[in-house]
Amino acid sequence: MTVGKSSKMLQHIDYRMRCILQDGRIFIGTFKAFDKHMNLILCDCDEFRKIKPKNAKQPEREEKRVLGLVLLRGENLVSMTVEGPPPKDTGIARVPLAGAAGGPGVGRAAGRGVPAGVPIPQAPAGLAGPVRGVGGPSQQVMTPQGRGTVAAAAVAATASIAGAPTQYPPGRGTAPTPVGRATPPPGIMAPPPGMRPPMGPPIGLPPTRGTPIGMPPPGMRPPPPGIRGPPPPGMRPPRP
């Protein structure tokens, strides 16, 4: 239903209205809505009706009933008059306006992650993990570079680690002899690094007299039956 702004019904919205029905009952409530059939909605409504006495000598008495929210049918409505102005809004919480004065706090949006200007906390020196380059490859090897550059850097790092000179205490100009390796006598070449020395007596000592050729030196277990022992020193093993 389209109603103009100058309608009298709209001007009485939220007023206390007195509505009289055909049967004589009176409804007084706050006028909230209506339609084209004059159906009304009243809130905080009270009903007043007159009760006739049984005897003619007794006067009529009026009875009041509290109804609350009421829907009145327009076909039963006889008259409608203003009972009072709209009630004042008391105790209703309203949303504060944007320009209203606020409190001492500052409203900020909840951010995600670490802000750009805040420094990242670091662990103490004693609790931090190993530094890059200590106990592992150097920083040059770990830095992403081209294929050839990475391979060259890795070879250079390995060579620098393998060929680094060892510092010895003063007074000792040569490196100590490795444990478990005997110094060969003059005139005998030592085996190259990584190769086992030949089987037999220790280097620099002649074979013991009384030991037959092909028998293991004292202190070593003989080979199992059916397996020939190692050849004597200075002889090449037979070809299969």
Swiss-Prot record:
Which residue intervals make up region (Repeat-rich region)? Answer: 175-236
Q: What InterPro entries is this protein classified in?
A: LSM_dom_sf, Sm, Sm_dom_euk/arc, snRNP-assoc_SmB/SmN
Q: Which SMART domains match?
A: Sm
What does the record give as the function of this protein?
May be involved in tissue-specific alternative RNA processing events.
**Further information:** Encoded on a bicistronic transcript that code for two proteins, SNRPN and SNURF.
The cellular location(s) given in this protein's UniProt record come to:
Nucleus
Positions of the region Disordered?
165-240
Family assignment from sequence similarity:
Belongs to the snRNP SmB/SmN family.
Q: Which residues carry this modification: Omega-N-methylarginine?
A: 108, 112, 147, 172
**PROSITE patterns for the chain:** SM
Write down the CDD domains for this protein, in alphabetical order: Sm_B
Kindly state one GO CC term assigned in the UniProt record.
U2 snRNP
Name the record gives this protein: Small nuclear ribonucleoprotein-associated protein N
For the modification Dimethylated arginine, which residues carry it?
A: 108, 112
Residues with the modification Asymmetric dimethylarginine, per the entry, are 108, 112
Biased composition (Pro residues) is annotated at 183-205, 214-240
Subunit-level organization: Interacts with TDRD3.
**Alphabetical keyword list:** Methylation, Nucleus, Repeat, Ribonucleoprotein, RNA-binding
UniProt signal peptide: none
Q: Which GO terms describe its molecular function?
A: RNA binding; snRNP binding
Question: Gene name on record?
Answer: SNRPN
SUPFAM superfamilies of this UniProt entry?
A: Sm-like ribonucleoproteins
Instruction: Give the originating organism.
Output: Bos taurus
Q: Where are the sequence repeats?
A: 175-181, 191-196, 216-221, 222-228, 230-236
